[in-house]
Amino acid sequence: MRALTPPTIRAAFRGQLGGFALDAAFTVPATGITGLFGPSGCGKSSVLRCLAGLQHLPGSSCEVGGEVWQDDTTFLKPHHRPIGYVFQEASLFQHLSVKANLLYGAPRESGKAHADAVEFDEVIELLGLAKLLARSPRNLSGGERQRVAIGRALLSQPKLLLMDEPLSALDRLTKDEILPFLERLHARLSLPVIYVSHDITEIERLADHLVLMQSGKVLAVGPLTELQSDPKLPLAIARDAAVNFDAEVESYDADYGLVRLQIDGGRLLVPSAPVATGEFRRVRIAASDVSLARELPQASSILNAIAARIVITSPVGANEMLVVLALGREGHGGRLLARLSRRSWDLLQLAEGVDVYAQIKGVALAPGRDGHV
């Protein structure tokens, strides 16, 4: 029996939008969160409008989960595409309560909801909206308004959720309040999401896959961690370059306030509030927080030293080296970045293929994806 092909989102949008040329083609899994990332004005929002059918570029194509939304003979109008759309600014009906706003997006036709339909009570719980239902949108904070807008989009029972810079109008504190709610949605719902942002911290927290854009074109497509660690791409050579791992909690040491995490190719000890064994957390490790040693350090204040192999190197400027490491004694684990001075590189006599220990000075641990904020 032939194995089932995993569902995908396939899109190719080409054409002129005023004075802007869009030439963006990509295929991504129709699962999880796909980040659409690049500098302002690179065409991210234009791609989202094309996916929604709000922009019609002849000769383009779009297929979601095996359903053709656009090709040479087909073009589904926006209201015929099963999408939810969350904009930068939450557009709520001021004369309706929060509950009425949420229900406004729900399908009124019997049988319209699909097998993965999300229930009203589930949306309320996931987004923490129970105490807001009777209130007017006029009395909501910016973060609360955006959570209501997300809930309304979910209750329209979409097969694809489009999010166009949903946090860009919010201050950093409010963003930090909303991100855990988005992580809960990611953990609990099977709905595929295309998430547009020019803020790499949002992408690092949320995305599983990444479409990297520049000047109307797609530079690269793939799993987030692969693109983060590719020295040919701008993410890896940026001064704030980092990689992410999805880690499983192995144990918690209450005496020292440390959680032991299993990642692909090693283990980490990270300061944390109490967590339960078996939880999954996303961790971020900056290249600037990684140093290398030829031998396992015997006395060091750095808690984490993981065996690794140098697999790729690339000069950065005249006096630095970008090093891509594969974790594990055989170099079969996840990829990690380190940024070294050329002097350190020469003193340690490093080269591709050399086995080292990666000393990790700092690890950023995201809130849980298990439904707890």
From Swiss-Prot:
ABC transporter domain segment(s): 4-240
Official protein name in the record: Molybdenum import ATP-binding protein ModC
NCBIfam families cross-referenced by the UniProt entry: modC_ABC
Oligomeric form and interacting partners: The complex is composed of two ATP-binding proteins (ModC), two transmembrane proteins (ModB) and a solute-binding protein (ModA).
Membrane topology designation: Peripheral membrane protein
EC number assigned by the record: 7.3.2.5
GO molecular function: ABC-type molybdate transporter activity; ATP binding; ATP hydrolysis activity
Binding site for ATP: 38-45
Function according to Swiss-Prot or TrEMBL: Part of the ABC transporter complex ModABC involved in molybdenum import. Responsible for energy coupling to the transport system.
Family: Belongs to the ABC transporter superfamily. Molybdate importer (TC 3.A.1.8) family.
Domain Mop intervals: 299-369
Keywords: ATP-binding, Cell inner membrane, Cell membrane, Membrane, Molybdenum, Nucleotide-binding, Translocase, Transport
Top-rank taxon, per record: Bacteria
Subcellular locations according to the entry: Cell inner membrane
Reactions catalysed, as given in the entry: molybdate(out) + ATP + H2O = molybdate(in) + ADP + phosphate + H(+)
A Pfam match: TOBE
Any single Gene Ontology cellular-component annotation: plasma membrane
